[in-house]
Regions:
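Extended, low-hydrophobicity, polar/charged segments
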Residues: 1-168
Length: 168
């Protein structure tokens, strides 16, 4: 699949806004949709391949966490920064109807509705990062500044420091 022939809703959205980005295809493994596999397929640093997790806060409703592929979301930290007492990952069956995206193809840009987004602080450590382009098999290469701006995200510490504490 040539990156010149790829068109996704995310790409159309960003083109309309005049945002610079790249679309990078990769081979999908239906048995491993994780960010570590994506990073390996792209020959990129897994710290730069960010995954998108949709959650539900007890006060805020739906929220989005965007974090490096080799880290796990800390639900307590995310709840605190988002003004919730607790938050829980969205059940997989609710992902498509809520966001318009499927597992392994969920982009923080261009969801059906605008949800408050929180991106982990390490996003600013890189000249560019990767997030899903809205379909399996295509990653969006974008500057952290543009990603934050287009998602209207809050940058915050939302991951476990010790991977042994993780649940997701």
């Amino acid at each position: 699949m040539s990156s010149k022939n790829i068109k996704t809703n995310v790409a159309r959205f960003l083109q309309k806004k005049g945002v610079k980005f790249g679309l990078i295809p990769y081979e999908v493994d239906e048995n491993d949709l994780g960010a570590e596999h994506v990073a390996e397929s792209l020959s990129e640093n897994v710290e730069q391949v960010f995954k998108t997790i949709v959650l539900h806060g007890d006060k805020s409703g739906y929220i989005v966490g965007v974090l490096p592929g080799n880290h796990e979301i800390d639900l307590k930290k995310l709840a605190k920064v988002s003004g919730n007492k607790k938050c829980e990952p969205l059940p997989l069956k609710d992902l498509l109807p809520t966001t318009g995206y499927i597992r392994g193809g969920c982009s923080p840009i261009g969801m059906k509705k605008k949800f408050q987004t929180y991106i982990h602080t390490t996003v600013n450590s890189f000249p560019y990062v990767f997030v899903s382009a809205g379909v399996r098999g295509v990653q969006l290469k974008i500057s952290p500044v543009d990603l934050i701006e287009q998602t209207e995200a809050v940058v915050a510490d939302i991951v476990y420091e010790d991977k042994n504490e993780s649940i997701i």
